[in-house]
């Protein structure tokens, strides 16, 4: 119970108020990840996703271009 009371008093004494800001300050953890590393990781994800779509996406793309009637069948 003492742990809750001490964290409550720490929160009340800081300058962060309101619902949106009612979370602990996590800037210490965010400094461990660099923006350059994050951008590199995101670039790798985008490339892998684009390669997968180029290989297997062509037949699905052609099928999706065919108009469908109201009963769900494709018309030719």
Swiss-Prot record:
Entry GO terms, CC: cytoplasm; nucleus
Domain of life: Eukaryota
Listed Pfam families: PKI (PF02827)
Polar residues composition bias: residue spans: 1-10, 64-76
Gene Ontology terms for molecular function: cAMP-dependent protein kinase inhibitor activity
Keywords: Protein kinase inhibitor
GO biological process, any: negative regulation of protein import into nucleus
Cystines in this chain: none
Entry-linked InterPro entries: cAMP_dep_PKI
Task of the protein: Extremely potent competitive inhibitor of cAMP-dependent protein kinase activity, this protein interacts with the catalytic subunit of the enzyme after the cAMP-induced dissociation of its regulatory chains.
Family membership noted in the UniProt record: Belongs to the PKI family.
Protein name: cAMP-dependent protein kinase inhibitor gamma
Organism of this sequence: Sus scrofa (Pig)
Lineage: Eukaryota, Metazoa, Chordata, Craniata, Vertebrata
